[in-house]
Amino acid sequence: MTGYEIAKHAKVTPEKVRAYTESVDFSHLSAAERAAAIQKLAAMLNALSLEERQSLRQDRTAYKWFEKMTEDEKGEFLEATMPTGFKQMIGAFEDMPPDKRKKVVDQAIKQMKDQREKMAASGQLPSPGTNAVVLSQELQDKVTKIGLQSFYSHSSAQTKAELAPFLEEMQRTMESGRMLRQPRQP
């Protein structure tokens, strides 16, 4: 077998993640087996691109086990699968003044709504419970005022999982820099 063939078989794909989650009966594993299975799933997810992870979230593949996990397992899974970029993004968000935080939150929510509308128009509405805008106006105001780190650190594992699409959109918004650039003076 050549190096290319070995690499091809070793490369994690969304299909391999689907096959893994379907092949393991998570609810019948011992605590040690569950921990090992969660770590393997986390490693597989971390090897995927952002777009591949989002496709698995849309069809709920990556999170089929989530409802069966204990709160501690959920926390460990989320910590293991949170990209380093998220942690950096949360830190950068914390350093922003409240007016810029509000712009980022508003833009991320607008992008998510626009994406849902495009999917609905093309007949590709995602599964229920995926990619929905999860922040009420009250929560948007709270995130803007106290910062994402404080909000996120006090949230339950379930809330953190529900926030993942929003955080991804915020990260994309902040990375693009569109909302953070100062308007040009004439």
Over which residues does each language-model region extend?
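Residue-level signal for the start and early helices of compact helical domains
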Residues: 3, 8-11, 87, 142, ...
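Immediate post-signal-peptide N-terminus of mature secreted/exported proteins
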Residues: 3-76, 180-184
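Residues that form generic nucleotide/phosphate-binding pockets
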Residues: 44, 80, 92, 166-169, ...
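A generic secondary-structure boundary signal that marks alpha-helix termini
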Residues: 50, 113-117, 172, 179
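Non-cytosolic head/periplasmic domains of membrane-anchored proteins
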Residues: 60-152
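Extracytoplasmic/luminal low-complexity segments enriched in Pro/Gly and acidic/polar residues
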Residues: 157-186
